[in-house]
């Protein structure tokens, strides 16, 4: 994956969390993930489009639409051998201190879609 492809992947991924339209959000999930892809963290282990769509909807409704936060890159994004490392932060859309910092590790299939996503989230220290 070259830098332009990596930037496009991350842009679509972040856009998915911000997307208010449920049909468009589902389309982004299906574009980004394998049909049996998984999203894992210490709090959940979900698999498949329906579960991932529900997870993204919950996060969007709570953090983006509900509390006015946005997600954005927070550090260097890197990729090799089908693995992507992406640091992100959640901040108020109108400015203010960071609410959360995360590291997402993506394992991609040969077609570039997500096979597995491992999420690590650090809560705010504010």
Regions found by a protein language model. Name each.
Residues 13, 29, 37, 52, ...:
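Hydrophobic pocket/interface hotspot
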Residues 15-19, 43-46, 92:
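Short histidine/acidic/glycine/proline-rich micro-motifs that form metal-
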Residues 57-126:
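A beta-strand edge to alpha-helix "cap/lid" segment located at domain peripheries
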Residues 1-32:
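Short acidic-aromatic low-complexity motifs
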Residues 6-16, 41-42, 59-63, 115:
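Short, mixed-charge, low-aromatic patches
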Residues 26-82:
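A solvent-exposed, acidic/Ser-Thr-rich amphipathic alpha-helical stretch
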């Amino acid at each position: 994956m070259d830098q332009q492809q990596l930037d496009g992947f991350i842009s679509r991924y972040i856009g998915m969390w911000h997307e208010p339209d449920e049909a468009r959000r589902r389309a982004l999930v299906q574009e980004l993930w394998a049909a049996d892809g998984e999203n894992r963290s210490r709090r959940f282990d979900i698999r498949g489009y329906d579960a991932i769509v529900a997870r993204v909807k919950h996060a969007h409704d709570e953090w983006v639409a509900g509390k006015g936060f946005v997600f954005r890159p927070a550090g260097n994004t890197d990729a090799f051998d089908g693995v992507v490392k992406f640091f992100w932060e959640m901040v108020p859309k109108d400015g203010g201190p960071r609410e959360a910092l995360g590291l997402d590790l993506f394992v991609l299939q040969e077609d570039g879609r997500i096979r597995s996503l491992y999420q690590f989230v650090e809560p705010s220290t504010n």
